[in-house]
């Protein structure tokens, strides 16, 4: 009898079907070693997943027989009176649906001001199974579970051993012929590549339909059903459905099993759903990062690691509603961030702070509006691909949007200046962006722009406006962002007007108390111009311009919306430059 320590699942479909199979295999091998403290790790490689055991396992009939008693995924009872196979633990979909419906009605009554009775909690799995049910995936998994439980013990054992041996030898599970060979329907919610599409090799008369069941390997689908109970989640996007699967980069089954209870944020828009799913995973990892290092099975981001070193991505499949059907319309992958690694406990706190702040800022964006949808798109590109230029473009565009939002007296949220500085410093210490934000001229000009825009907007709202509000300044900087001379002209003209207003205010007040602003010096402008000279590339110039808007539109270090805490400065006859 052969002993095996490593097993392989290829990335054949290019979808989350491969991930589901790899996670399912991880759980199966963990169970075959008795569960409990058994350590089974799944690692993502370029073209496959490798599932590794702490100790080699001998595959034989007696060992795998445990899978017949517990096929490792739930039988879902969707109709009153429906019974699960003997010995298996069912998931009561009917009862959980009744509780979910009660919650929905309770929310309506709460809005009407009525008192509410205490309700039982809905299982986090219900909302996943609900979407699987809509996508017609429950029948296939229930049917296979029934066949596994009812199979002849020796035939099932021989089949499982043969399939696992094939995976251990780097072959496909479908290459191992077995006497136990149930037919499994091709279901797109578990395997998006078998969804509606062109399946013939030639163009003449190509039919649109699912992959025939004869081409679907029952063991691979079994692994996917197991994996779906661990890492599959979803969102309703209007009448459409978006399913998500967490991709392990390097995680043990105990890592993954805790995801079964993770309740992802629920939103009804696609881009925001992607972003919040990543945020939820990062916060989940950071909450576990302070577990003692000696517990090798526990969830933690090790020293020197970033979130992407544990979970590489969230794979998605979008099912578009066409009335009576919801065919697959888009397959994508959203990477987890690798902004900076956790080097000490303080970094865990910073991660949490950044994520919560960014979540709050993005929450107000309405994806149904073109400008705000583009903001979310830029942020998602940054989050998924560590695309810092997209983030800078997001910050610049967000500054413009928030100015208009404030003037319309609509709620808005801003980034905190200190947090932005920390994010850039911790994540990009070797890149020019740190040199830019530490430049004294840049800092002083950004502060002056903030005083002439968001600070004076705040003063206007309080009935204390003194200076002109430069409403179009952010947009003008954004328009000229790629052109060094034109950008410098915009900044120079602003400084000239800013200093003129300050001088006129000083003349009006003379030695009387009142709110003043400090002028921008020629030295500041010179340092900013030299900064542009050091980074003459168009993208670099654009990055500096976007950073200028970002730091001009963010909150001060105290977390206040403006610098009005500095208002009504006592008169001084000392000329102090910013």
Named regions from a protein language model:
Residues 103-275:
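Basic, glycine-/proline-tolerant helical and adjacent loop/strand elements
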């Amino acid at each position: 009898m052969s002993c095996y320590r490593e097993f392989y699942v290829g990335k054949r479909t290019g979808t989350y079907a491969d991930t589901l199979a790899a996670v399912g295999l991880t759980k199966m091998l963990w169970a075959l070693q008795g569960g409990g403290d058994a350590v089974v790790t799944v690692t993502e490689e370029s073209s496959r997943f490798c599932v590794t055991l702490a100790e080699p396992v001998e595959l034989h009939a007696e060992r795998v027989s445990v899978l017949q008693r517990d096929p490792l995924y739930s039988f879902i009872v969707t109709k009153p009176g429906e019974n699960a196979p003997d010995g298996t633990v069912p998931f009561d979909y009917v009862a959980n649906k009744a509780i979910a419906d009660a919650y929905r009605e309770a929310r309506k009554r709460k809005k009407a001001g009525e008192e509410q009775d205490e309700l039982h909690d809905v299982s986090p799995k219900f909302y996943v199974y609900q979407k699987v049910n809509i996508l017609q995936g429950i029948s296939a998994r229930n049917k296979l579970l029934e066949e596994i439980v009812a199979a002849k013990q020796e035939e099932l054992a021989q089949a499982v051993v043969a399939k696992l041996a094939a995976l251990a030898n780097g072959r496909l599970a479908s290459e191992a012929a077995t006497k136990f060979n149930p037919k499994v329907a091709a279901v797109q919610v578990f395997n998006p590549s078998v969804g509606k599409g062109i399946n013939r090799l030639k163009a003449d008369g190509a039919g649109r339909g699912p992959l025939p069941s004869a081409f679907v390997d029952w063991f691979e689908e079994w692994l996917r059903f197991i994996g779906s109970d661990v890492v599959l989640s979803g969102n309703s996007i209007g009448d459409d459905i978006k399913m998500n699967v967490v991709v392990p980069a390097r995680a043990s089954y105990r890592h993954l099993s805790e995801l079964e209870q993770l309740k992802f944020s629920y939103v009804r828009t696609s881009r925001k759903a992607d972003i919040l799913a990543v945020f939820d995973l990062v916060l989940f990892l950071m909450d576990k990062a302070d577990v003692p290092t000696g517990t090798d099975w526990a969830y933690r981001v090790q020293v020197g690691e970033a979130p992407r070193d544990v979970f590489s991505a969230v794979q998605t499949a979008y099912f578009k509603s066409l009335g009576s059907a919801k065919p697959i319309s888009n397959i994508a992958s959203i990477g987890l961030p690798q902004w900076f690694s956790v080097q000490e406990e303080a970094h865990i706190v910073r991660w949490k702070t950044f994520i919560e702040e960014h979540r709050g800022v993005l929450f107000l964006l309405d994806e149904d509006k073109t400008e705000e949808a583009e903001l979310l798109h830029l942020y998602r590109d940054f989050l998924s691909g560590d695309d810092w230029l997209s983030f800078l473009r997001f910050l610049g565009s967000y500054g413009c949007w928030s100015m208009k939002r404030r003037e319309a007296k609509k709620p808005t949220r801003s980034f905190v200046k200190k947090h932005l500085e920390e994010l850039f410093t911790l994540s990009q210490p070797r890149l020019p962006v740190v040199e830019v934000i530490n430049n004294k001229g840049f800092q002083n000009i950004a502060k002056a722009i903030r005083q002439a825009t968001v600070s004076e907007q705040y003063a206007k709202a309080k009935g204390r406006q003194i200076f002109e509000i430069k409403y179009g300044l952010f947009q003008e900087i954004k328009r000229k962002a790629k052109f060094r001379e034109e950008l410098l002209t915009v900044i120079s003209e602003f400084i000239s007007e800013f200093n003129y207003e300050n001088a006129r205010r000083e003349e009006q007040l003379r030695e009387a108390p009142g709110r003043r602003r400090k002028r921008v010096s020629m030295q500041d402008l010179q340092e900013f111009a030299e900064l542009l000279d050091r980074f003459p590339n168009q993208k670099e110039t654009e990055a500096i311009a976007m950073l200028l808007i970002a730091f001009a539109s963010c909150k001060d270090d105290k977390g206040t919306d403006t610098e009005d805490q500095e208002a009504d400065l006592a008169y001084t006859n000392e000329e102090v430059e910013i």
